[in-house]
From Swiss-Prot:
Main location: mitochondrion
Enzyme active site: 143 (charge relay system), 240 (charge relay system), 270 (charge relay system)
Its job: Acts as an acyl-protein thioesterase that hydrolyzes fatty acids from acylated residues in proteins. Regulates the mitochondrial S-depalmitoylation of the nucleophilic active site residue of peroxiredoxin-5/PRDX5, a key antioxidant protein, therefore modulating mitochondrial antioxidant ability. Also catalyzes the deglucuronidation of mycophenolic acid acyl-glucuronide, an active metabolite of the immunosuppressant drug mycophenolate.
Signal sequence, renumbered to the chain: none
Catalytic reaction(s) noted: S-hexadecanoyl-L-cysteinyl-[protein] + H2O = L-cysteinyl-[protein] + hexadecanoate + H(+); mycophenolic acid O-acyl-beta-D-glucuronide + H2O = mycophenolate + D-glucuronate + H(+)
Keywords from the named record: Hydrolase, Mitochondrion, Transit peptide
Gene Ontology BP terms: protein depalmitoylation; xenobiotic metabolic process
Control of this protein's activity: Inhibited by palmostatin-B.
Species this protein is from: Mus musculus (Mouse)
Keyword Nucleotide-binding listed: no
Span of the transit peptide along the chain: 1-43
Stored InterPro entries: AB_hydrolase_1 (IPR000073), AB_hydrolase_fold (IPR029058), ABHD10_acyl-thioesterase (IPR052382)
Name listed for the protein in its UniProt record: Palmitoyl-protein thioesterase ABHD10, mitochondrial
Length: 297
């Protein structure tokens, strides 16, 4: 049974799907850390993962203790976002390993964006896990990255020991597309492109190839149980106009792991990058590191 435990101080609520104490109480007890100011200002240097038959991937890595943290960005986002950098600073302050990277076709990575698909970006995540990361990892996925982290946990259960999703967009654009009127879907198919309005793009919209949507259909997860057995934390803003917060409840319901919490931010939007949002994210990571420290060598 899901149990709500609102915390007025920070304005979030935890919904526990497992037989363990909800996160909201422990989060409320944690004082804000001084990691914002005390962490070293030096950033990890830019490196490239060379792949023989795939585009080279740009990444930044901090070596340190396990479990390591890997930040998986959202759709068309690069590794330099506020959340990714904040998590890096926190990991640096604790001495934990951390990786952030750009998908192929994005940011500093090689590749042609027009040819990118969910399947290719899934391979990017697995490449980082297989060829860059060392030891057990906690994956932090934002939006599309939340969808891809689920795929990574399914494909590499021996290496992925926990997940944190931020506005997890499982089945993302596919669900939005199929919610359109049939006539609109036919128009998009004829044009070969979907012009999707968005205030998060300076042009006011995204141009999404029809082929991208059709390929993404092969990676949908919500139609059946999701075979992820590790601890999962799903953070979502209730003012998210891109991915409704109910999507995180759907994901939680589908995941087979008994250790799943959904944490809602009443004032949070899709990007979840305000100070209180970042604080919640950091506390959630800290909580999982504490939890896993008893089982991870």
């Amino acid at each position: 049974m899901a149990a709500w435990a609102p915390c007025r101080r920070w304005g979030w609520a935890a919904v526990s799907f497992g037989r363990h104490p909800g996160l909201s109480a422990s989060l409320a007890r944690k004082p804000p850390r001084a990691w914002w100011l005390s962490a070293c200002r030096q950033k990890a240097s830019l490196s490239f993962l060379n792949r023989s038959e795939l585009p080279n991937l740009a990444y930044k890595r901090l070596k340190g203790k396990t479990p390591g943290i890997i930040f998986i960005p959202g759709y068309l986002s690069n590794m330099n976002g506020i959340k990714a950098v904040a998590v890096e600073e926190f990991c640096k302050s604790l001495g934990h390993a951390f990786i952030r990277f750009d998908y192929s076709g994005i940011g500093s990575s090689d590749g042609n964006l027009a040819e990118c698909t969910v399947g290719k970006w899934r391979k990017d995540v697995l490449s980082i896990l297989d060829d860059v990361a060392e030891g057990p990892q906690i994956l932090v996925g934002s939006s599309l990255g939340g969808w891809l982290m689920l795929h990574a946990a399914i494909a590499r259960p021996e290496k992925v020991i926990a997940l944190i999703g931020i506005a997890t967009a499982a089945d993302g654009l596919v669900t939005q597309y199929h919610a359109l009127p049939v006539e609109t879907q036919k128009e998009i198919e004829m044009k070969g492109e979907w012009t999707l309005p968005s205030r998060y793009n300076k042009e006011g919209y995204f141009r999404i190839p029809y082929s991208f949507i059709k390929e993404a259909e092969h990676h949908c997860l919500l139609h059946s149980p999701i075979p992820v057995t590790c601890p999962v934390r799903l953070l979502h803003g209730m003012k998210d106009e891109i991915v409704p917060w109910q999507r995180s409840l759907q994901v939680a319901d589908r995941i087979v792991s008994p250790d799943v919490d959904v944490i809602l931010r009443k004032q949070g939007d899709h990007r979840m990058k305000e100070k209180a949002d970042i604080h919640l994210l950091i506390c959630t990571i800290d909580d999982l590191i504490d939890k896993l420290s008893t089982v991870v060598p």
